[in-house]
């Protein structure tokens, strides 16, 4: 019999280093910091153990989604650095992100390019029928 102590784990296991809650959940966002902010923010009297993990996962997903779309916008503009303009284009061209961040103003973001179809020059791909309304 091995006396594993209070931990109940394997005795003498050197690889049992302290692991952060972010690492346990497979996240990059800080679960501990989010938990502290939820407790200090007076949102509720008590905060469950799963709430900061879930919130960190949601925030990480949203950040990854926005950064992926902004990276695509930067690549389309032949740039290697994401600027606020690329974030603006990414968010406003995505229907769901635009709905989520509809009331948000992005500094230095600019506006979406849009020209009404009536103002565009007529397409001259195919010539029109000769003498259409002129013949009487």
Swiss-Prot record:
List localization entries. Nucleus; Chromosome
| UniProt cross-references to Pfam families, sorted A to Z | Histone, Histone_H2A_C
Q: Which residues are reported to carry the modification N6-acetyllysine?
A: 6, 10
Q: Where is the composition biased (Low complexity)?
A: 12-24
Q: Which GO terms describe its biological process?
A: DNA repair; heterochromatin formation
Where is the motif [ST]-Q motif annotated in this sequence? 133-134
* Chain positions found as N5-methylglutamine: 108
The main location is nucleus
Where, per the database record, does this protein carry Phosphoserine? Answer: 133
What post-translational modification information does the record give?
Phosphorylated to form H2AS128ph (gamma-H2A) in response to DNA double-strand breaks (DSBs) generated by exogenous genotoxic agents and by stalled replication forks. Phosphorylation is dependent on the DNA damage checkpoint kinases MEC1/ATR and TEL1/ATM, spreads on either side of a detected DSB site and may mark the surrounding chromatin for recruitment of proteins required for DNA damage signaling and repair. Gamma-H2A is removed from the DNA prior to the strand invasion-primer extension step of the repair process and subsequently dephosphorylated. Acetylated by ESA1 to form H2AK4ac and H2AK7ac.
The remark listed among the other comments is: In contrast to vertebrates and insects, its C-terminus is not monoubiquitinated.
What's the stated role of this polypeptide? Core component of nucleosome which plays a central role in DNA double strand break (DSB) repair. Nucleosomes wrap and compact DNA into chromatin, limiting DNA accessibility to the cellular machineries which require DNA as a template. Histones thereby play a central role in transcription regulation, DNA repair, DNA replication and chromosomal stability. DNA accessibility is regulated via a complex set of post-translational modifications of histones, also called histone code, and nucleosome remodeling.
**Domain text:** The [ST]-Q motif constitutes a recognition sequence for kinases from the PI3/PI4-kinase family.
Assembly notes: The nucleosome is a histone octamer containing two molecules each of H2A, H2B, H3 and H4 assembled in one H3-H4 heterotetramer and two H2A-H2B heterodimers. The octamer wraps approximately 147 bp of DNA.
Put simply, this protein is called: Histone H2A
**Source organism of the structure:** Mycosarcoma maydis (Corn smut fungus)
């Amino acid at each position: 019999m091995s006396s594993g102590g209070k931990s109940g784990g394997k005795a003498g296991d050197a690889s049992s280093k302290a692991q952060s809650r972010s690492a346990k959940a497979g996240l990059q966002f800080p679960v501990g910091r989010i938990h502290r902010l939820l407790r200090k923010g007076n949102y509720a009297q008590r905060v469950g153990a799963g709430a900061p993990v879930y919130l960190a996962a949601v925030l990480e997903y949203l950040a990854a989604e926005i950064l992926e779309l902004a990276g695509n916008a930067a690549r389309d503009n032949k740039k290697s650095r994401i600027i606020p303009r690329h974030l603006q284009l990414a968010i406003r061209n995505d229907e769901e992100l635009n709905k989520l961040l509809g009331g948000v103003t992005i500094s230095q973001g600019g506006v979406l390019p849009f020209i009404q179809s009536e103002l565009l020059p007529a397409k001259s791909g195919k010539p029109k029928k000769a003498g259409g309304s002129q013949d009487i």
